Amino acid sequence: DLAPGITLDIMTPSDVSFLDVERGKVDMVINRFDSMPQSFHQIHLWDDTFSCILNVDHPMLENFTLDNYLAGDHVWVSKTGMGVGVGVNPDDVQRLGWVDLAINKLGKKRQIRVFTRHYQAAMTLAEQNDLIVTLPTRAALLKRDNPRVVLRDPPLDIPPLELKMAWSPLLQHNPANRWLRKLIADTARELDGQEPTL
């Protein structure tokens, strides 16, 4: 037990604004960022590829081609849990995700049937239905030993995502925050040294 008195409040990206981080109300954010205020401190944690999860009885398993992938029914994990162009706060409106940007570059679209904010919910849905979930490999590996699912490489090139940790300049020298950032960075380096394998 490195910090027996610590309390963690882990939130999804749509629950936090950059203003909360900037003011030091949030200790740090860990995510992929398309853009970030220049005043924030940040470090790279790791790069991740993508994997697909399908249930063992999925009819496309034997012929997991791009055309079949696109014709299948998908679960999309988005920061809002809602589709493109939908959001309670206009600043949180979801744009195309990493996977759909790669598909869009091919001039194609996929059939998204379920939107959720949670990887675990998406993986459970794929386990119990004929749905395809495409998500970061490190998340997919949580189901590696589950006999009800199969992990596959996506049948298209999806650029890897870069996971970063960012925090406010107000917390740069805070001893508790520095300790936690170091612990997270050290753990990420340890994990990054272990190549994810399907």
List where the protein language model places each region.
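Ligand-binding "clamshell"
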Residues: 36-49, 130, 143-153
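Hydrophobic hinge/microswitch elements
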Residues: 13-17, 22-26, 88-150
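Secondary-structure junction motif
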Residues: 60, 64, 70-106, 174-175, ...
